Amino acid sequence: MPLGGGLKSVPNGLNPPSIKLVKWNDVFGVEITEKEINRVTAVAEETMAEVIIGIGGGKTLDTAKAVGHHRNIPIIVVPTTASTDAPCSALSIVYKENGKYSHALWYPKNPDVVLVDLDIIIKAPIRFLIAGMGDALATYFEARANQESDSLNYVNYEDGGYKRSQAAMALAELSYKILLEDGLKAKVAAENGVCTTALENVIEANTLLSGLGFENAATAGAHSIANGLTALPENHKTLHGEKVAFGVICQLVIENRPTEELHRVIDFCLSVGLPITLEELQVEATLENIRIIAEESMAYTWSSEPFSVTSNMVYDAIFATDKYVHHYKKSMFT
């Protein structure tokens, strides 16, 4: 039973004549909410679906995972973009009707099958690939924060999680290295509709490496900022990974990491076109908005940082990040 959202038709490999498909391309809405999950789950129940196939972007795939979990049926995900690390993860991010972050649903297992077709991915708007780099960019820095705080990961999360492995840290770091080395090359290739080794590497980093990395090492400040941004309606037009990229810089600022590292991340974001100021995220840089983001972000994973974080610290970090990036960009042309 395919859950549409990314393709006009089901790929031939998923549509053999011996299998009856019940398509609901027009059923899934724009937002993944509890109401939407329950509605689509009802469709799966009514049609006695034996398999759920999610074809589309991150929210479509997260919905498919939720439906498959509720119905206890196998889950196949077919991402049509490389915009997030959702395809491989054992969770779904649920939002409220107004687009604000609500909560996460945690599952005992990952999707049964993840099919990534490069011919499909490279046809997606370039913005999605870039946003995926923003999401993957956070994996290493958040893993490092969790390592320094000795926090538990997201494996079997509802029972408390486990200590991260060295393999998880290696995957997270590899994801970051691939972005720095191949990110810009991948963007140029995708813009011109060709598939290169660099593009393949970045798609792997965005989906597999980042997905395994964040689940097995957990998130921290960057995703807290991203979720805090969803409290502002004007920011809802931006993609998850775009929010996360700004969150990465805020996290580095609040951690007071070396200037060289901060500049390396800013330079990468600028090179691929990730938004890294509030204005670029369609948010007016008012003190009130910054306060809202900071306070909303406290409900998430700042506790994974290696020190106690307060909303005032986050407020200062957001303000400083926005001003610093503006200053840095101006200095490039003087």
Regions found by a protein language model. Give the residues of each.
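ATP/NTP phosphate-donor binding region
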Residues: 1-51, 278
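Short glycine/serine/threonine-rich phosphate/pyrophosphate-binding segments
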Residues: 6-9, 34, 59-66, 84-88, ...
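A short, small-residue-rich loop immediately preceding and capping a beta-strand
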Residues: 44-80
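A glycine/threonine-rich phosphate-anchoring loop and its flanking beta-alpha core
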Residues: 69-167
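Active-site segments that bind and position negatively charged phosphate/pyrophosphate groups
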Residues: 156-267
